[in-house]
């Protein structure tokens, strides 16, 4: 947990705002976990859980972090493993050697990109439905009949669990007439996606990827961020228009704020924005 910046960022953010909730999502897994699956599924599941538990334990020991959510599947999986999700829920519920109550950790699934297969499986499988608290979807502002049913009948939260951060540098795009903050992936376009994601998908959270970036000038995704920190050795950072756009939402809708469906609207169009 000390090899990358992520856990340190989380600790710094919690020091500023203790009410922040934390979600753990894996993009891969160590080779020793993958090798365990060559022995049997049981060996693989046990190895993967040991790795996750060791991470949770270390994050608490080193940084004092308590995680509220775990995304059960690997990022943007194309194959949902129901058996693993149920195994993870069972092990967390029966964990007796933990620095805090792991039974309270909620599961998010399944961080798919552009699809909602997990929702249909949850409708058909009551055990899976009971194990999962949040449906996480990537890069879509839309739900479907299954996500709507799970939200309305079963109280499952729907998250836009990975969405683009604004991708333009406002100082290079704004015009003399104060236009220019528009276009695909602009700050206004991302604001439009946040608005549309509730009206069209019942999504109550938008997670930026990335919120903080340290890409060098000219690198792929270089302008994609809320906060740019390409020179950490100097202490310099830049807040672009996306940061202030996000603040409009976070300051307007504090935790616990409720949506009034009749007062919400989004035209369902993505990759566009009001021009003035």
Spans of features found by a protein language model:
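Substrate-binding cleft and catalytic face of glycoside hydrolase catalytic domains
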Residues: 1-124
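Substrate-binding and catalytic surfaces of secreted/luminal carbohydrate-active proteins
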Residues: 53, 57, 79-276
